[in-house]
Swiss-Prot record:
The lineage of its organism: Bacteria, Pseudomonadati, Pseudomonadota, Alphaproteobacteria, Hyphomicrobiales. One of its GO terms (molecular function) is unfolded protein binding. Belongs to the chaperonin (HSP60) family. Its EC number is 5.6.1.7. It is found in: Cytoplasm. The keyword ATP-binding applies. HAMAP family: CH60. This protein is a major antigen in patients with bartonellosis, an infectious disease endemic in high altitude valleys of the Andes. Keywords: ATP-binding, Chaperone, Cytoplasm, Isomerase, Nucleotide-binding. SUPFAM superfamilies: GroEL apical domain-like (SSF52029), GroEL equatorial domain-like (SSF48592), GroEL-intermediate domain like (SSF54849). This is Chaperonin GroEL. It is an enzyme of class 5 (isomerase). PANTHER family: 60 KDA HEAT SHOCK PROTEIN, MITOCHONDRIAL.
Length: 544
């Protein structure tokens, strides 16, 4: 076991604070509309330029083990806020630094760290309640665009694109962000349910120019197992042929005699047909087939529920207005499912999302939810260089996350203003002087984001904060972009409540733990062994 080095008391806290300050000082220059960029060196490829707080925090690793502990604890504040709200990481870092700085001073003045923590926790609870009380629900597409624009650092085109995407696929819809191959940023919306399985044979193609299968008003056979035997499939094929409608078969696989017959049938101009593999694997495949059945008002043909393929009637098949099948994807547009049944299925998936502890399962459930509830939108971020595209993609990701958070819990004025107002309204009392001091730490720390935004814009922070607090209106604040005092909400300067709340809660949680630290243990760095000396002397009889 390697030897350990131990630091105690004031010495330990000072080293922690030094690490916190190094990380926070690198991150906080990015805060606000006039925040600066940070350039991050990469071991391969071009350096990365970003204004995203968590991206900067994740790159910082300090040489001194004790200082690094402080930096990593503060990095956790940014990461946790990013996981919960997807934005507000820089605000969380600034708040965390302010709470640690004030807390270390209080502990140095012989106050009880545990009582300080209790005071901090009580104050945070009161501030969060105040934020919820003042929150304004988002109703219009314009308000969604405003939130997205602020988080994208004032880029109105990004704000409008995200608002359009949310309008088209709904609040539950999946919106993904990808890097484009061109210089333009564009939005592509896939309506209906799409899954990543294409046609099993190119002979099914109806549009040879685009190599697509287009089926209008088809029946949809949803089968859980493999289809290889033709005899069991014949009754369904005959019934569909008599109706004159096309047929889409979704099954685990279609092979052998069954596939050959379907292809020959299509080539002879008999039945307009296509077959695709079922999406997903195992239990997830079963669930997705059920989703397709609900969406198209069909039934999953499965021997588990006692339905044999030879007994299937047309009433058991799903219906849709259109189906498009490419080499790699299948899209079902405007399924015939009952709205009430689809809503019940959506509620069931939402309940599963709440219960799951696996991030992977949650992501897959959200994908299923989106496919049922609305559709999928893809924002392709373009730019002239790879560095520009990556920087822009960071901003689009932040804007998208902030917008989702705003729809969920509502909005408050931006620019750190609600935290300033909450500090003024913080009237709770502690049970003893040390708890009072903990409440005071939060009261002072709440000013830090607004001060940092002003400082990054080259303004005198104390003057800006003073003028904002002189006005009694909750929505009055300072617009750093235009250097004007005004009603922030009417000008679209807003922040999602979820972002502000998560930033404060996570900052206080980690910072109060740092304050209560009394000892630190780290491994003693190993001394590098000196390289062996080169053997002396040259080769005999050789002159150089």
């Amino acid at each position: 076991m390697a030897a350990k080095e131990v630091k105690f008391g004031r010495d330990a806290r000072e080293r922690l604070l030094r690490g916190v300050d190094i990380l926070a000082d690198a991150v906080k220059v990015t805060l606000g509309p006039k925040g600066r960029n940070v350039v991050i060196d990469k071991s391969f490829g071009a350096p990365r330029i970003t204004k995203d707080g968590v991206s900067v925090a994740k790159e910082i690793e300090l040489e001194n083990k004790f200082e690094n502990m402080g930096a990593q604890m503060l990095r956790e504040v940014a990461s946790k806020t990013n996981d919960i709200a997807g934005d507000g990481t820089t605000t969380a870092t600034v708040l965390g630094q302010a709470i640690v700085q004030e807390g270390v001073k209080a502990v140095a003045a012989s106050m009880n760290p545990m009582d300080l923590k209790r005071g901090i926790d009580a104050a945070v609870e009161a501030v969060v309640a105040d934020l919820f009380k003042k929150a304004k629900k988002i109703q219009t597409s314009e308000e969604i665009a405003q939130v997205a624009t602020i988080s994208a650092n004032g880029a109105e085109d990004i704000g409008k694109m995200i608002a359009d995407a949310m309008e088209k696929v709904g609040n539950e819809g999946v919106i993904t962000v990808e890097e484009a191959k061109t210089a333009e940023t564009e939005l592509e919306v896939v309506e209906g349910m799409q899954f990543d399985r294409g046609y099993l044979s190119p002979y099914f193609v109806t549009n040879s120019e685009k190599m697509m299968v287009d089926l209008d008003d088809p029946y949809i056979l949803i089968h859980e197992k493999k289809l290889s035997n033709l005899q069991s499939l014949l009754p369904v094929l005959e019934a569909v042929a008599q109706s004159g409608k096309p047929l889409l078969i979704i099954a685990e696989d279609v092979e052998g005699e069954a596939l050959a017959t379907l292809v020959v049938n299509k080539l002879r101009g008999g039945l307009k047909i296509a077959a695709v593999k079922a999406p997903g694997f195992g239990d997830r495949r079963k669930a997705m087939l059920e989703d397709i059945a609900v969406l198209t008002s069909g039934q999953v043909i499965s021997e588990d529920v006692g339905i044999k393929l030879e007994n299937v009637t047309l009433e058991m098949l799903g219906r849709a207005k259109k189906v498009h099948v490419s080499k790699e994807t299948t899209t079902i547009v405007d399924g015939a499912g009952q709205k009430s049944e689809i809503n019940a299925r959506v509620s069931q998936i939402k309940a599963q999302i709440e219960e799951t502890t696996s991030d992977y399962d949650r992501e897959k459930l959200q994908e299923r939810l989106a496919k049922l509830a609305g559709g999928v939108a893809v924002i392709r971020v373009g730019g002239s260089t790879e560095v520009e595209v990556k920087e822009k993609k960071d901003r689009v990701d932040d804007a998208l996350n902030a917008t989702r958070a705003a729809v969920e819990e509502g909005i408050v004025p931006g620019g750190g203003t609600p935290l300033l107002r909450a500090a003024k309204a913080l009237s709770i009392k502690g049970k003893n002087p040390d708890q009072e001091a903990g409440i005071g730490i939060i009261r002072r720390a709440l000013q830090a984001p607004a001060r940092q935004i002003a400082h990054n814009a080259g303004e005198e922070a104390a003057v800006i904060v003073g003028k904002v607090l002189e006005n009694c209106s909750d929505t009055f604040g300072y617009n750093t972009a235009t250097a004007q005092f005004r009603d922030l909400i009417s000008f679209g300067i807003v922040d999602p409540v979820k972002v502000v709340r998560s930033a404060l809660q996570n900052a206080a949680s980690i910072a109060s733990l740092l304050i209560t630290t009394e000892a630190m243990v780290a491994e003693v760095p190993k001394k590098e062994a000196a390289a062996p000396a080169m053997p002396g002397g040259g080769m005999g009889g050789m002159d150089f």
